[in-house]
């Protein structure tokens, strides 16, 4: 494709709030934030229409944040994800062709929530993914099962039971 320049910043904050506010082994509150801001551009290319374009599959913004709350045998987790628009080809095609193979990947956000209960060696968990029920896609397949976009799953819920030996 050519030569590209990528630069930006990424940081992770993982903060145990309960250690700061409470003196309790039964209570836990943890916050995390993982954020990146990446600028990516082709600085030279022998191909027409590529120089100056954003590098494909490199979103400008990527953010994941969440909060975990634990009290005795109970735990809940809330996680939010945001991903900015990105391109799937070096020409930065915005509109999809008929095959769906080229074109941009629109921005999306996702909210997940789960609740757990621990007793002896068992963990019981109930949760939901994609609670905002927004439809998005993160890939454009050129072959199987495509060609075309691969949509995200719909809002879903789960129940699990785990036993630790």
Go through each PLM region and give its residues.
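Flexible, active-site-adjacent loop/turn segments at secondary-structure boundaries
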Residues: 53-56, 85, 103-108, 129-130, ...
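Glycine-rich, flexible loop segments associated with nucleotide phosphate handling
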Residues: 25-33, 100-105, 150
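Short amphipathic alpha-helical interaction segments
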Residues: 103-107, 111-114, 149, 153
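Extracellular loop and loop/strand-boundary signature of outer-membrane beta-barrel proteins
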Residues: 1, 47-54, 97-103, 144-149
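Transmembrane beta-barrel architecture of outer membranes
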Residues: 60-64, 110-112, 154-158
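C-terminal beta-signal and adjacent terminal beta-strands/loops
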Residues: 29, 82-94, 116-165
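Structural motif
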Residues: 70-71, 105, 118-119
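Gram-negative outer-membrane beta-barrel transporters
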Residues: 1-91, 160-164
């Amino acid at each position: 494709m050519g030569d590209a320049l990528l630069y930006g910043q990424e940081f992770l904050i993982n903060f145990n709030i309960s250690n700061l506010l409470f003196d309790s082994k039964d209570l836990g509150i943890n916050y995390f934030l993982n954020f990146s801001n990446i600028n990516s551009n082709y600085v030279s290319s022998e191909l027409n229409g590529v120089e100056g374009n954003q590098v494909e599959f490199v979103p400008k913004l990527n953010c994941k944040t969440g909060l975990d709350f634990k009290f005795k045998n109970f735990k809940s987790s809330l996680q939010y994800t945001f991903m900015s628009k990105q391109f799937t080809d070096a020409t930065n095609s915005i509109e999809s062709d008929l095959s769906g193979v080229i074109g941009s990947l629109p921005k999306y956000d996702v909210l997940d929530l789960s609740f757990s209960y621990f007793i002896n060696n068992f963990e019981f968990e109930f949760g939901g993914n994609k609670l905002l029920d927004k439809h998005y896609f993160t890939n454009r397949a050129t072959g199987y099962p495509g060609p075309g976009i691969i949509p995200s799953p719909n809002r879903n819920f789960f129940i699990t039971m785990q036993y630790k030996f």
